[in-house]
Amino acid sequence: MKLYINRNPVNGPWGGGNGATKAIFDHMVTNNLTCVGELPDTIIMLGLEREDNLGSLEELVSYKLKNPQTKLIIRVNDCDARKGTTGVDDRFLAASRHADGAIFVSEWMRDYFMNKGWACKNNTVIVNGVDQNIFKPFDGNTKPFENLRPKVVKIVTHHWSDNHMKGEDYYEMLDEFVGRNPYRFQYTFIGRTKAKLKNTQVVPPLWGKELGVALSQNDVCINASRFDPGPNSVIESIACGLPTYVHTEGGGGVEFAGHDHTFGTWDELENILTQKLLPNAFQTKTWQTFSDEVYSFLKGTSHD
């Protein structure tokens, strides 16, 4: 099987889409798949283009129309609600009329497009994986709040994108809260943000082992992102053993963190931070498992 992917993996602090691409590139050869640089006549997997992409969504649909034997697979990891854009939904919906299969990054992402008239009938949900050799509890501690609460609670947030939908309103309120309670709470923000933070340790974007170590040394992760299709930031903090709380409008983040780990107002978040913090029930998986699931779907689709 020859597989074409219209995106190249890169090293650095990027989102889950890059992690998924890298995992597929790393793993597919072991399953007798070949990632090729020219359009094949068998399988295509794609996402919305970036500057380094090898073919836009529309170009790959055009290729499919000219070569109907090609199996067109869409990985759906974006939407207009995520960043307040226009046109992203329409592009995916148009492509769904020609796709042979679609991989959604969360159930929320699937339901979002189904409610808008998604046309493809062969769909699956495959949640991103995580490198469990990197994102793991600090010193093997998997339940940091089982018996007692630390004297100073270390709060962390991490995002590689500084889009305002990532929750900067709550991060500014967190910053003010920590300023009022410096002997009870510390707040670290890792990544990019436009939030005005005075009492927060802001760390430039990290990735890989550096990010895993930095996350695991905290006590709780707060993620206020809205309408996030499948946030790897939530998966990574849970893998590090951190109780992770997300906004009620967090999109895919809610199904990862769990409905019992959500907040919809500042009062709710403050109450969470002053009570016993509980681990999430969500079980993360490796990128190997993710790639196995993708391969299984591709193989099944290619035989249809």
Located regions from the model:
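N-terminal pre-catalytic "stem/leader" segment of glycosyltransferase-like enzymes
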Residues: 1-51
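Extended catalytic core of nucleotide-activated donor transferases of GT-like folds
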Residues: 31-34, 39-98, 108
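Donor nucleotide-sugar binding/catalytic pocket of nucleotide-sugar-dependent glycosyltransferases
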Residues: 100-114, 119-138
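Short hydrophobic beta-strand element within catalytic cores of glycosyltransferases
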Residues: 243-247
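A charged, aromatic-enriched C-terminal amphipathic alpha-helix characteristic of glycosyltransferases
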Residues: 267-304
